[in-house]
Amino acid sequence: MQYSEGQLGRVFVLRIDEGEDFLAALQEFVRKKEIRTGSVFFLGALREGRMVTGPEKPIIPPEPHFVFFEGGWEVFGMGTIFPGDEGPMVHYHASVGRAGHALTGCLRERAVTYLLVEAVVIEFTGLAIRREFDEKTGVHLPVHGTEGGTPEKAKGTGDESSRKETTGREDKEGDGDLSGGLAAIIRDLTRRPAS
């Protein structure tokens, strides 16, 4: 595992309207605002789109299994924004659903908005990361330490004493690698009686 540490930059809230290609609109916005690294969260509805729902077979490099959907599907998802050879690359994963059917995967090439898609883009600053094609896996991977910094290696894998040092807390009730706040919320939700 590698990781990079940075800071939060600007925050944008977007509305993508009926008939607009959500993927193209967001890519254009990211370029226009010169967002090099960040994350996007979105929800709304899509009239049609194309999605990779996994590989045809679990081999490396993978052969993508494409699914085309149309007819007005609810959507929510997220994506990462990292610099690539031709500028910022946005990598989206989403779930879409309609009338008891659902798909989850990587949105690709086209996603036409039905009514609207709302998106929140959060810019990151100070990250040493970029997306590069990996010959072995056949996909574009985030590579740490390529923007002037050095990648960090994860410390304390499974060692309780080092976990306390690196996170400033001890694990409680087997919450593993969850952050303290998220772990507390999950514990609270799982202890509540059903309403």
Located regions from the model:
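Long, low-complexity, intrinsically disordered segments
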Residues: G174-S195
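Intrinsically disordered, low-complexity terminal tails and inter-domain linkers enriched
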Residues: T150-S179
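N-terminal processing/targeting junctions
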Residues: T113, T157, R169, R191-S195
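N-terminal intrinsically disordered, cationic/polar leader segments
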Residues: M1-V90, S95-E152, L182, I186
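Intrinsically disordered, low-complexity sequence elements enriched in Ser/Thr/Gly/Pro
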Residues: A128, S161, T167, I185, ...
